[in-house]
Structures are given as C-alpha cells and as structure tokens.
Amino acid sequence: METGAAELYDQALLGILQHVGNVQDFLRVLFGFLYRKTDFYRLLRHPSDRMGFPPGAAQALVLQVFKTFDHMARQDDEKRRQELEEKIRRKEEEEAKTVSAAAAEKEPVPVPVQEIEIDSTTELDGHQEVEKVQPPGPVKEMAHGSQEAEAPGAVAGAAEVPREPPILPRIQEQFQKNPDSYNGAVRENYTWSQDYTDLEVRVPVPKHVVKGKQVSVALSSSSIRVAMLEENGERVLMEGKLTHKINTESSLWSLEPGKCVLVNLSKVGEYWWNAILEGEEPIDIDKINKERSMATVDEEEQAVLDRLTFDYHQKLQGKPQSHELKVHEMLKKGWDAEGSPFRGQRFDPAMFNISPGAVQF
C-alpha cells in the first residue's frame, strides 16, 4: 500500500484512537476486528482448506509489517542525526573561516629583500675583482633547505587531515537505509536483515515464478538451500552453511509472486550475526543498530515496561503509582471489615506513605 493511500484512513483511525484513549486498546480494536470479521486467526491445516493461514504465518505477517515501519522510524532518526551533524559542520566551517580572516588581518607584511654589495678580494686566475653578492642565491638555497626541514612537519600535518572513512562502514550505512538489508547486507544472490531474535533473507526470483510449487526451500539447523524448479531440474539460487544455528521449528518461508522467496530464520541464541553464510563477507556489527525491538520483548518484560510507563505518567500528574494503588486496594478491603477500628471512617490514601520496595509484583 502506498503511503498516500494509507493516510486516507488517518481520520477514521484517529477517531478510534481518541475514543479508546491509548495505543494498547487501539490495537485490541484492530485485532478484535480481524478476529471477528476475517479468517486472520483461522489455521489452514489441510490442503483442501480455502480459508485461514498456515501455523505461524499470521504472526510472521504482523511482525513483518511492524518491522517495515520500525525500519522507517530508524531511518527517520538517522536522517535527523545526519541533518544535525551537517548543521554543526557548517557552523564549525563558518567559525574557522572567521578566525582565519581575523588572523590574516593581523599578520605582519614581510620586509622585501634588498641587495647588499660586499667588497671581497679573491684571487681568480691571478686577477682581483670586486664581486657583487646578492642574497637571492643564498635565499633560494636557504628556502630549499627550509623546504627540506619542513618536510617532516608537512608529513605530520598531512597525517592530521581526516582520512575518508573505511569502505566497509560506508557500505553498511547504505545497507542501513534499505529495510531489506537493515542490520544486514546486500549480496549477489540475496539480501538479508536481522533483529535481536530473527533474520530475514530475500532471494530474488524471475517474474514468472508465482507459485510456491515452483521453488524448493530446504532448511536445517545449520544450512539453507533455495532453488527454482525448471524443466531440466533445479537451479540453485542460494545454498550454504549458516554461520550460526537456527531453530527450524519456528523458521518459515513464503513466496512473494514474481519478486522473491522470503525466508524468516529464528535464531537459537540472542546475538547479532555478521554474516548469513560461511565464506560471506562479514559486516561490521559495530555499525548496526543494536537497540532491542519491542517486538522481541516477552510478556513478562512487557508487563514490567507497561507498569514503569504507567508509574512515570502517574508521578508526573501527582497521582498514586502502581505499588501505592495495590496497597490502597488491600487496605480498603479491611477498612470497613467487621471489627476494624477504622470502620465508618473515610478512607484517606494520603495517610499512608508506601515505599516501592514494600510491594511485590
């Protein structure tokens, strides 16, 4: 979908968001609609089934859409950073020019060299003559000597000139601008990207390849093979040994008709890969974005993040935080209980000072 077409729905979606009040409930509305009105959550278990998705395909589809806009957001961040660096660079250049101009105005004008006539008596072929000695000769010789003396300094000065960045980091910057090679690379027969837990490999296919039965994909824990079926057999598009192990049970592939075979590989360990295949030119993992995507956070970590976010907003508004609300709820239950000395009195949360460490979540 084009960006302009997607923006046509902004007003309707904005109305929903304003009505529910937060992103979490907004997403519940969207996925609830998919659950009630579509076959999005229906599993395609048999070849004869005409509705639904294969196991894991719907989740992979959602993750792919998230990654697309996550890449766009990272590109926006990178663009803003580059614009800021460009402004700083221009400002520094202008300041340097101003300082140079001021220094040039204060620099003293050199005194012109004058001819000096020296009388000397020299025996040359038995004759005496007065020679007119002019400094230009010696001056040139001294100048030549000074050039030789200044040569080491010139070399040292040249060493201070910033060199161009190495080719590899510059290439990685280009990879980062492409969602298909974000945190990965573009190779001759395929393109790959990665996040904290998964890798995505795109293997281009000809336009006439539009059905899954026209390709063959074989995945093992340590290897990958992608081939295209032809009349005379198979044409291998990508094949090799993986640089790290993958989880084949949660890895899957699909065909984008006439475009590419899309292979999603699930990492066994949570670490960054510098290459997909052994023998492939490695990328510099120090030049990639190592921030962990929210999509890779499990439910327990997500709950903690949600609680911290809630507490932050409550604190800004001067309202009770989650640990205080939990204790208040417990106190309210016993406030008016039979035999309570506080029964009949108004419950005032301000009477209690509760530290965060006093509550277990």
UniProtKB/Swiss-Prot annotation:
SUPFAM superfamilies: HSP20-like chaperones. The gene is NUDCD3. GO terms for cellular component: cytoplasm; cytoplasmic dynein complex. The lineage of its organism: Eukaryota, Metazoa, Chordata, Craniata, Vertebrata. Residues 87-97 have a biased composition (Basic and acidic residues). It comes from Homo sapiens (Human). One of its GO terms (biological process) is protein localization to pericentriolar material. This is NudC domain-containing protein 3. One of its GO terms (molecular function) is unfolded protein binding. Residues 148-158 have a biased composition (Low complexity). Residues 87-106, 124-158 are annotated as: Disordered.
